Amino acid sequence: DCLGWFKSCDPKNDKCCKNYSCSRRDRWCKYDL
């Protein structure tokens, strides 16, 4: 199970879906460009 767009996340334990990454500043999953 992974976190999708705009889901809140922990940068130290990034569980965002493939092609997403946890933003340290905003603390939600953002699309990786």
Curated annotation (Swiss-Prot):
Pfam families: Toxin_12. Expressed by the venom gland. It comes from the Eukaryota. It is found in: Secreted. One of its GO terms (cellular component) is extracellular region. The keyword Cytoplasm does not apply. Keywords: Amidation, Calcium channel impairing toxin, Disulfide bond, Ion channel impairing toxin, Knottin, Neurotoxin, Secreted, Toxin, Voltage-gated calcium channel impairing toxin, Voltage-gated sodium channel impairing toxin. The presence of a 'disulfide through disulfide knot' structurally defines this protein as a knottin. Belongs to the neurotoxin 10 (Hwtx-1) family. 04 (CcoTx1) subfamily. Negative results: has no effect on some calcium channels (Cav1.3/CACNA1D and Cav3.1/CACNA1G) and some sodium channels (Nav1.3/SCN3A, Nav1.4/SCN4A, Nav1.5/SCN5A, and Nav1.6/SCN8A) (IC(50)>30 uM for all channels) (tested in fluorimetric assays). This is Beta-theraphotoxin-Cd1a.
